[in-house]
Amino acid sequence: MSPQTETKASVGFKAGVKEYKLTYYTPEYETKDTDILAAFRVTPQPGVPPQEAGAAVAAESSTGTWTTVWTDGLTSLDRYKGRCYNIEPVPGEKDQYICYVAYPLDLFEEGSVTNMFTSIVGNVFGFKALRALRLEDLRIPPAYIKTFQGPPHGIQVERDKLNTYGRPLLGCTIKPKLGLSAKNYGRAVYECLRGGLDFTKDDENVNSQPFMRWRDRFLFCAEAIYKSQAETGEIKGHYLNATAGTCEEMIKRAVFARELGVPIVMHDYLTGGFTANTSLSHYCRDNGLLLHIHRAMHAVIDRQKNHGMHFRVLAKALRLSGGDHIHSGTVVGKLEGERDITLGFVDLLRDDFVEKDRSRGIYFTQDWVSLPGVIPVASGGIHVWHMPALTEIFGDDSVLQFGGGTLGHPWGNPPGAVANRVALEACVQARNEGRDLAAEGNAIIREACKWSPELAAACEVWKEIKFEFPAMD
């Protein structure tokens, strides 16, 4: 058939390339309650109009490709295409725009974070017409949320399992993160739990290495949990990292944890992947295990201000995929995190309904329609002097996790745990009495030092430790 010969299917079809904005930029579009809405920070290449850049994002993340294809006529593009419906310049930034894109719900497989991200961010970030692209926020409609199980248990169920109310939970990451034998590792777990912590934790890269195979670690940690529970009368846990090279191996480790009767397991959800995470979350709900989530690799995705994906999007995705805890930054420790922005995505993790608030980075009102909440975990370079600020910032429904801030105590692990527990109890009591933790925090800690030599020793060691660096560009 010669190139000039028309077929029946090509009647009305005009081959060639046309501007994306002619099809995918629709400023008159009124969004639907069932649409997934995305806010992209777009930096076009020189000479590319923002309308064309926004339309290109909508096209390449939905039904579009670089040229017109005759099979467009075999479906309804108006029904399935993404639409760039609004564009705002970013104040104070040259040639940056917030482009809002609406996606019809039919584009996405039910209950699949993997498919949602494959569509929205899977291909478009390498598009040549863009110098940079960042997904700032997503609005997940209730109709789509209802296709997900979400967290295995949620905040209230975890409180009931631990029988612990009215205060933040305390944790500790065992250090050194790599190199300990399973028996010595279990010893450190016992000492920290016995000293007053609620949880201890495998670090993100503790899986099953030659110096400590996973089964040995699970056994010694279970022994530490039961021994500390018997001696304190409190329910304890250790985040046993079930992350593995295959989904089958991951589930096998979770099964063994359940057989040991421990309360919680752990997963590295970004390196492990959303499909694996959702599978593990379903197993945990069915078998009564809490699920702690580590966000290892997140800064590769979210740290650049004009390219990648903001952590609030990863946090929303985790709430859909499933996890009872997730690391959220500290605001005050060694890892980056602005207070208002951090509290914005903390609310998105915990609350059932969150109003749009651009000052906190929340681009859309989000209704979670009773999907269980996720407890934020503050971790990274924190110590007893930070306790008042952490208690005031994160409130009761949080885990405050001190690794070096426990194990680095000059008297050893148990006094380190005691110091953190005393500092927390002092801050909670002061708050309940109506004192201002932000203004009186240091005084509250100093008062508690008078009747806790363990806390006094910790305060002396870390009194000058700060992590203050200029904000990133």
Swiss-Prot record:
Top-rank taxon: Eukaryota
Keyword RNA-binding in annotation: no
InterPro entries named in the record: RuBisCO, RuBisCo_large_chain_AS, RuBisCO_lsu_C, RuBisCO_lsu_C_sf, RuBisCO_lsu_fd_N, RuBisCO_lsu_N_sf, RuBisCO_lsuI
Residue sites binding Mg(2+) per the record: K201, D203, E204
Catalytic residues (UniProt): K175, H294
Chief location: plastid
Enzyme superclass (EC): lyase
Quaternary organization: Heterohexadecamer of 8 large chains and 8 small chains; disulfide-linked. The disulfide link is formed within the large subunit homodimers.
Protein name per the record: Ribulose bisphosphate carboxylase large chain
Organism of derivation: Lavandula lanata
